[in-house]
Design a protein with these regions (language model features):
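Metallo-beta-lactamase
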Residues: 1-25, 33, 66, 70
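Accessory terminal helices/loops
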Residues: 4, 9-12, 71-76, 83-142
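Active-site metal-binding loops of divalent metal-dependent hydrolases
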Residues: 20, 41-42, 80-83
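Acidic, metal/cofactor-coordinating or nucleic-acid-engaging core segments within structured domains
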Residues: 29
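Residue-level marker for buried hydrophobic side chains located in beta-strands
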Residues: 36-38, 78
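A short, flexible beta-alpha/helix-coil linker loop
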Residues: 43-50, 84-85
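Second-shell loop/turn segments in exported
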Residues: 50-53, 104-106
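An active-site-proximal "capping" alpha-helix that borders the catalytic cofactor pocket
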Residues: 53-80
Length: 142
């Protein structure tokens, strides 16, 4: 594989390093010819984000990773964590970014894990995996 490109049936698949998202050293796969990004753990679609491995600086790095994905101008984004009935719209990039911003804002404005958890549920009541949110709230307030 020369560089970060893979040829698959005449399509270039580019491995794009993203840095920290829900863990360190995340990558995504970009298929420019069809406007596709397989975002892996960088983008969530209708699911609470896994934030226990991040502090405010790491969450800023995640937002930078989302900016990088957005700069690829995808028409479809395959999220690594997804509510099955949701489509693969690129709007999930901004939804993931906004979730991180909401979490950071509320982490600063709350005092207990339960308060942070409850406030996030008020903003994001329909997301799956409330256990991930609880783990994130506990980590942010420990």
């Amino acid at each position: 594989m020369p560089g970060n490109l893979i040829d698959l049936e005449g399509h270039d698949l580019a491995v794009v390093p993203l840095g920290h998202t829900d863990t360190d050293n995340t990558t995504c796969l970009h298929v420019p010819s069809i406007g596709l990004v397989v975002a892996g753990d960088a983008v969530y679609n209708g699911v609470h984000l896994w934030l226990p491995e991040s502090n405010p600086q790491k969450r800023r790095e995640w937002i930078t990773a989302l900016d990088r994905i957005e700069s690829l101008h995808p028409r479809a984004v395959i999220a690594g964590h997804k509510r099955p009935e949701n489509d693969d719209s690129p709007k999930t990039i901004e939804e993931t970014r906004q979730y991180i911003r909401d979490f950071d804002r509320l982490a600063s404005a709350t005092t207990t894990p339960r308060e942070l958890y409850d406030k996030m549920l008020e903003l994001h009541p329909d997301r799956l995996s409330r256990g991930a949110l609880w783990s994130s709230a506990r980590a942010a307030k420990s």
